[in-house]
Amino acid sequence: MVDMKLAQQKGFSFGNATKFMDFADPRAMIKDAATLDPNATVPAYMRTYANPRVIEVLTAERAYRKIAPEVKNGDFTTAFTQFRSIEFTGNTTPYGDYDGNGVSGVNTAFPVREQYRFQTTVKVGDLEQKMNAEAKIDLFAEKQKSAAINIDIAFNKYALYGVAGKAVYGLLNDPSLNAAITPIVVNSTHTVWAEKTANQQMDDLNKLVASLYTQAAGHIDDSTKTKLLVSPATLAAMNKVNDYGVTMKKMVADTYPNLTVVVVPELYNATLETSTMILLADEILGQPTVEFGYADKYYAHEIVRDLSSWKQKVSAGTYGAIVQLPFAIGSMTGI
């Protein structure tokens, strides 16, 4: 059973609910008759029990959660969040008894991100609730789960693209990132991996790796844990084999053992029929390269009784992608 206090600390708010519904234990569920009969008030079980399935949805694996960790910043009332970015600087000189040369310092920055609040609603009619209950379906709980799914889809979108017109940026369009490099052209025109051999694909990846290592100025090498973000089309192209029967995937695993491939469907451009791939370090000197900030994962507002129905607003708040180390992210577009 999920702990209510821990859930609140992680950004899940269920209003006046004091416990989670145990769907595995019929004794914990309200009797059908009590959920079916229309009355002037909201059924007590809706206020007393929280639906644990929304937590399952909002913590399950989704593309952005495989890329970087999520971090809670503030709460529903927080308008802006400020995070700290530190770059280490300095140099050394030959030792001398009376020499004070050489200095070590830091460059600090405090970027600000705005909270974007978004919402959806759950509505249940008396008749539809009664009809679904005949089939042993808790319609209100299922619609809450649907709300959680829609919220999670939105979180994924904002983590990658941000929100237009606000200081909320995504991993794919953060203004602090370096411009994407281009793949190697083969046969005069081909850049897309579907038209390249496994070895030619590997050449493109090596080019991206070299570019990232160079801009990181020695902070990233083969021992650094990294992630390669690719589209489904790119992942499929990586199954090509070279003249020795070795796939691109196998070559990547052998050459870069600390690299993890993550599939991100949004990296495919259907209009151009090309993909982008992103290479990033998980962290540098203990500082994460990127985090996905949120204020509330699931904020359940009061359930409101109407003439013959109930409704509930569910909201959440995001700061998008908080890129702390732009130099630790590189990309290549047109593959």
Residues covered by each model-derived region:
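Short, catalytically relevant binding-site loops at active-site mouths
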Residues: 165-166, 177-178, 233-237, 268, ...
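Helix N-cap / beta->alpha transition motif
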Residues: 123-127, 231-233, 325
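Hydrophobic, Leu/Ile/Phe/Ala-enriched alpha-helical segments that form helix-helix packing faces
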Residues: 151, 155-158, 205-216, 252, ...
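Alpha-helix boundary/N-cap detector
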Residues: 33, 37, 45, 49, ...
